[in-house]
């Protein structure tokens, strides 16, 4: 049986974390990870283009068949929520262009899947990611382990999707 490769994304307009994971049933192997950081001084449309182009490049390099991305949370700042939605959209568009199956997970679902508690802290999520992927040290910034958590959530829910 062949393993499935996925790109998992923790979206942000300033820092986007990503990871590439291979999995077969419940066995997960970390292939690569990193961050995409558009320039803060750039206008929003340039940052969105940068996110799109970088995700497209990563997908072409690693050839995943699935994208798992964290869904937007609904905060008090409407403008921030809209901008995050735009960032998510351009990354999902990159995946759609290359025919990836795209799955979205709410933050609470990700925490529930990894920690058994939808209100788990960032530290609890990091601990579980580190344990599951057998990381020697936690990558920084935290956006990377958040992206890994999205991918693990997909794997944990793969047979029910």
Regions found by a protein language model. Name each.
Residues 1-161:
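Phosphate- and other anionic-substrate recognition elements at nucleic-acid/protein interfaces
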């Amino acid at each position: 049986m062949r393993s499935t490769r996925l790109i998992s994304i923790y979206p942000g307009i300033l820092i986007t974390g990503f990871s590439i994971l291979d999995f077969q049933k419940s066995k997960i192997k970390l292939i690569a990870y990193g961050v995409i950081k558009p320039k803060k001084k750039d206008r929003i449309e340039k940052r969105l283009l940068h996110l799109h182009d970088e995700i497209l490049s990563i997908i072409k390099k690693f050839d995943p068949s699935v994208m798992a991305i964290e869904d937007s949370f609904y905060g008090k700042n409407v403008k921030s929520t809209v901008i995050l939605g735009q960032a998510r959209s351009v990354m999902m568009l990159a995946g759609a262009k290359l025919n990836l199956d795209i799955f979205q997970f709410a933050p609470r679902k990700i925490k529930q899947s990894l920690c058994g508690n939808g209100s788990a802290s960032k530290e609890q999520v990091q601990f579980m990611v580190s344990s599951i992927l057998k990381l020697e040290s936690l990558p920084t910034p935290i956006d990377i382990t958040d992206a890994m958590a999205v991918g693990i959530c997909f794997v944990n829910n793969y047979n029910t999707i």
